[in-house]
């Protein structure tokens, strides 16, 4: 899994990383599952960008999710947007659905 130059990643990855790569990543990884056409996913971006500002120790991985996508299924993702914060491959916290700066 490559390290982005900034904590916030504005585009979905062309292909999702394998679960083993996420599990082996050092430090914390914020996985964002959604789709570029999803209204709630788009609306969540300012809150996620604000959350990640100044947090160089967190990698943001934006994954387009859908039926048959193995990474999303491995975390039991059913609805977008869903964010999962992992450390050492273990989910530390997750948030499902609409997110705003007021949350």
Task: Show which residues each predicted segment covers.
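Short hydrophobic/charged patches on amphipathic alpha-helices used for structural packing
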Residues: 19-20, 69-72
């Amino acid at each position: 899994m490559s390290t982005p130059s900034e904590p916030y990643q504005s585009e979905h990855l062309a292909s999702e990383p394998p679960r083993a790569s996420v599990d082996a990543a050092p430090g914390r990884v914020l996985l964002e599952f959604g789709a570029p056409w999803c209204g709630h996913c788009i609306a969540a971006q300012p809150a996620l960008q604000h959350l990640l500002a100044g947090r160089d120790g967190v990698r943001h991985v934006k994954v387009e999710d859908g039926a048959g996508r193995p990474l999303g299924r491995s975390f039991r993702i059913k609805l977008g947007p869903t964010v999962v914060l992992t450390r050492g491959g273990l989910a530390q916290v997750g948030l499902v659905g609409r997110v705003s700066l007021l949350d």
